[in-house]
């Protein structure tokens, strides 16, 4: 298992050579993924940013840093293959879920759901509940889904593409449904990255509480 300090050092290798202006851009981009107060924008350092990323996304910190770097038009490959958590949940654990619990990360749940949709894997009870949002998206966003598909076919990605989802209490679930429809076309990994980019931590937490209450 990779120790946390080793992971921090690996991430720091990508940040240490950034200019001050580039780092400011990185901080601005990080606000989509991390809780940053107004004070953080002027006082946060590269070391503390790395610590925040590792703390918030222990299993996906490499992916988060790679997404953030895209704002600088830099495509980086952060080589961290080993899970930081001592007992990672295997994929089969998600396949048989019948309800959401506090110890399950919503990002893990969404990533596996998108993969099941892309690979046409039978859904368990909890995923069937989530899948109702995909059916709703097919009915409500047929034109918009076509436009998103055209964009992807032209550019090969959906990074920074504006999803046609109104911001309201259903924003997270509707975004999941929309991206689930696209998952077989764009691939579950890119669908998941778009979810991480587009849906804030606050909205994810609200949706997780909603799932846990059902």
Curated annotation (Swiss-Prot):
Family: Belongs to the orthopoxvirus OPG034 family.
Keywords on record: Early protein
Underlying gene: OPG034
Organism field: Monkeypox virus
Protein's UniProt name: Protein OPG034
Keyword presence, Phosphoprotein: no
Top-level taxon of the source organism: Viruses
Upregulating conditions: Expressed in the early phase of the viral replicative cycle.
Claim: Nucleus is one of the keywords in the record: no
InterPro entries registered for this protein in UniProt: Orthopox_C1 (IPR008724), Poxvirus_Bcl-2-like (IPR022819)
Pfam families, A to Z: Poxv_Bcl-2-like (PF06227)
